[in-house]
Each structure stands twice: as C-alpha cells, then as structure tokens.
C-alpha cells in the first residue's frame, strides 16, 4: 500500500507531460524536429465572426489549424505512418503505391502498366486516338516550321519504372481496351518521320544484360539516378546526327558509392512516406561518378530549350549543363522557366517571348515520360504554332469573340484555342507544313542578326542616347522595322552629337507648340495630376514622345537639315 502514492505520482507526472509537453513544444520549439517531407498545405488562422461561430465553420477551421501545428507533430505522424506501413503496407502519401518487396511506385506508373492511366485524362479509346493523332500531327508541323530557321524539334521519353520493373508491381487486372500513349506516339512518330528517343525499351535491354554497376531506377525512388548520364550521352549523339554537328562528349570518372544526400534523392518516394525508420534496399546499387565535358575546337556547344518534366532535374544534377551547352533553359511543365547558371533564375513561361526564345535555340527538346504523354506537350506545341504562323491581332480577335459569344474568361477562351488551333485558324489547318508566318517572326530574326554584330549593337546603344526615354529593346525594334520597311538605318547615322542636339531643339520647339494649344494643355494637366508630377515635366515627356514618334514614322529625318 505504501508504494501506491509513488505510482500515482509517476502516473500523474506522465499524464502532465503528455498534456503540457506538446503545448510547450508548440510555443517554444525547444526540441528541434526534422521537417516532414512532401507538400503540406497550411491552413491560415481563422478570424472569429458571429456567423462562422454559429455555423460551426470557425470551429472546423480552428480544429484543422491546430491539428497542423501541435507540438511534436512530426514524430507522431511518423509513428502513425510506420504503424500503417508495418501492419498493412498502407500509406496516405499522395500518389504513392506500395509494390511487392518494399518497392514503391507513382500511381500513374502503375496505372500505365495495367492500362488504366488513359482514363485519368481521356474518356475512351476513340477520343484518345483522335487526341494523339492531332498532337503528333501538330508536333510534325511545328518541326517543319522551325526547320526553316535552323531549329530542330525532337522528343525525348525517359524510361517508365512500371514497365522497367513490373515484377515488383502490386497485382492488378490489365485493361486491354485502352490505348497506351507511349506506344501509340512511337508508332505515329515512325509514320511521320518525327525524331524521337524512347528510353523504356532500351533500359529494358540494359536491365536484362545487367552489365552496369548502378541501378537504373532505385527501389524506392520515382526518378532515375546515374543512368540519366547514359541517356544524356545518347541524346547528344542523336542531336549530332540530326544536324550533322559535332557536339561535346561526356567523360565518366571512376565509380564510387553515392553520397548520403544523393541517396536521399534516389529514395524520394520513400522520403515522402515520412516513416520512423528507413526501408531496406536489397535491390539497389547506388553508385555514381564525376562527369566532365570534353570539347575541342571542332566541337559546337549547342543552345537548347528543354520543355518537360522532373526527369531532367536528375540529369542536370549529375552533368554540368553550364559547360555542356552554350546556353540552355528548362520550361518545367511549360509553366516555370529555369535559366541562368545552375538554373537558379525563375520566370513564368507566360511572361516570355516564345518566338524569341525558340529562335534563339539550336534544339528544342520535349522531355517527358510515357505515362505523361497522355497530356502531350502541355500546350507548348499549340501555342508555338499560333505564335509562329498566326498574326497576334487575329489570335486576340478570335479569343475575344469566344469570350463574348460564350461568356468565357480570357483563360477559358485561350484554352479552347489551345485545345484545337487547327479548327480556329486556317493557317494551321490541313495535313501540310504551315507556310503562313506571324510578322513578329521576321522582326525577331532581324533583331537576332543585329545582336550578332557587336559594332552594330554599339552604334545602336549610342543612338539610344539620342532617342531619350527609349530602351535598347525599343531601339532594336525600331532598327528592325527600318530594315523591314527599307528605311535608313540608325547604324549608319553619323554626327551623333549633332543629331542629339537637333533632337533636343526639336523637343524644345515641340514644348512651345504644345503650350500654344489650350485643349492639349488641359489634357496634359489632367495627366500630370494623375501621374503625380508637375505640368512642366509632363509637357516635356509628351513633347519628347511626339518627336520620337515622328522620327520613328519618318516624318522627321535626322539625316537632312
């Protein structure tokens, strides 16, 4: 009996710790927790209102918010996930499927192997055929358009894990009534003589030969590892053959066991399970080596635009792209453009000049996997064809017509055009390569030619000081228009200082002319008030714009007195 109070004290202490330790941890974070992997949406702290309190919405939001932020949340979730995995081989991780022998797959890889992935994107096999035929035809058309400008467009399909290691997939029933996108597109590419590399078949042969010291794709990973270097070399050699160029070689050093950080990326699916302990990987051989780029005076470093999925990131991890390419960009899912050293610069693709970017490349590579071919090129091919072959005004008017007639938003109307551009634009219809061209294409080609001439660019930068308030980009466009319209070139202008003085005198004369027009001055006063500047400064801005506009239109010729 004497020991009972002691036990009571111990139990009471444990109870208090269980009650208050999470509260203290939440407030102070005194124990450092390893963050959970993956994406977890954050619920904002709810604002209390009488309406939400009475309907129960406030309580639901607060409960959700608290469940995402209680102390020691990370180990509690890992403990629960471990319990689910050990006893039921079950996971709540989005899109991750547990295979046999502790293998992990993305859901779409499993679906594609068993023939059901098509239903995620298309209602039936007939619709799939129509869609795939149209996409393959549009790719062929775009390639023909770009070849006119020395740009090669090709397809690269990385290997699918489900088809490479089907023996570890969970048992499911095959659906034989559907169409496999990878196999269908390969047949279309062969028929259309469209250049492509399909890696699944080749990697299946490599797996059977079993001569490589490293795994092609890891047991619990979604993406390939060092095998991506082998694929990159094949891509380079194929690009060489397409244009008859000598491109850099990749040299592979001695193999060694992969570092822990690299192995963590090789097990990215497992990391997203958020278990307490790591799974065993008896099937993995995780080795890599240093990769160097070999060039000489006869080698050309290409300019490449990649558009596609996350499989490129592992290739980028092992290979020094900055040394391999003169320049390269990666348009991730045709949404975010990664560029610059190490692909550290990010820009929304929608903000970029597509014509300029594509014409600045030697090769445009659509980089994907077979299971993602159901979504084709995420609208890249359609948008590129409209940009290259249809005038901007026509595209805008067609979009506006859809918006007005169907009460659609800009985004909805634009998606209709993307879904079937051949239907809305006669320039893209039919089974032949489009011959119509957007006038912006000629402008871009001329500007690219100017940029290649350093002396020309220097002259234009000098002219920029004459045409004040004009950016170099605007001056380049003005010079391109001069070439297209057969006007005198700014490059050939002489006596720059004298011309600058003349422009300033023309601006001063225009200021006096504007001041003598009461109606115009009233408009300037309204603009000055709106812009928050003085009337004098607004008058100067408007006078300079009028002079620059007359110079641009040829009304004022700086070459004549």
Task: List PLM regions with ranges.
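Extracellular glycan-modifying ectodomains
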Residues: 1-515, 519, 526, 530, ...
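Short, charged, amphipathic alpha-helical segments
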Residues: 540-541
